[in-house]
């Protein structure tokens, strides 16, 4: 959506932006995998749902992206029934060479369900079982969203200069 925000005056909030997410940093997932490989008897035969330390609504994530890339865009609530035709148009355009679909029907379907860690039990584990300190969206995301700001990653930002 950071890329899309560079070119369009408004961004869609599919389903009103209420879908919940629990994003996790890929480096944290890798750390969990390494711990599982290093201690197979502790983790073998179990399934783990991995999620980050916080949950966000789709709307909250969109607002965070826009704030991070310093762009003001209108966020337009789009009900699911209206998003499906948009997804079909996106798929048709995506069939053209060198065109990335802006939205697909599969993405709309995925946005109908929250993407968060559920309840755990002895067979179903969670990120906490690995005992690692998780990175936050606020700590990681600005470093790779910087390229979508006006001036790109080379515009001055005291928060990103270390």
Question: Which stretches of residues belong to each language-model region?
Answer:
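A short C-terminal helix-loop "cap" of Rossmann-like NAD(P)-dependent dehydrogenase/epimerase domains
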Residues: 2-15
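Residues at helix-coil transition
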Residues: 6, 38, 70, 142-146
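Substrate-positioning beta->alpha
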Residues: 15-38, 45-49
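Substrate-binding strand-loop-helix patch
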Residues: 20-27, 48-68, 77-88, 133-135
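Hydrophobic "lid"/C-terminal helical patch
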Residues: 30-37, 65, 137, 144
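Core catalytic loop region at the nicotinamide-binding pocket of NAD(P)H-dependent oxidoreductases
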Residues: 36-51, 71-76, 99-103, 122, ...
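A hydrophobic C-terminal alpha-helical subdomain
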Residues: 81-162
């Amino acid at each position: 959506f950071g890329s899309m925000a560079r070119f369009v005056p408004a961004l869609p909030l599919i389903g009103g932006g209420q879908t919940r997410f629990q994003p996790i940093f890929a480096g944290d997932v890798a750390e969990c995998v390494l711990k599982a490989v290093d201690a197979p008897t502790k983790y073998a035969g179990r399934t783990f749902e991995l999620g980050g330390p916080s949950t966000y609504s789709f709307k909250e994530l969109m607002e965070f992206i826009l704030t991070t890339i310093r762009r003001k865009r209108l966020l337009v609530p789009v009900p699911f029934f209206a998003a499906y035709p948009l997804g079909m148009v996106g798929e048709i355009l995506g069939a053209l060479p060198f065109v990335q679909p802006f939205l697909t029907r599969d993405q709309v379907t995925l946005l109908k369900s929250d993407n968060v860690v559920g309840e755990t039990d002895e067979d179903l584990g969670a990120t906490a079982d690995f005992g690692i300190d998780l990175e936050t969206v606020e700590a990681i995301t600005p470093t790779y969203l910087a390229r979508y700001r006006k001036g790109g990653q080379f515009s001055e930002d005291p928060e990103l200069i270390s």
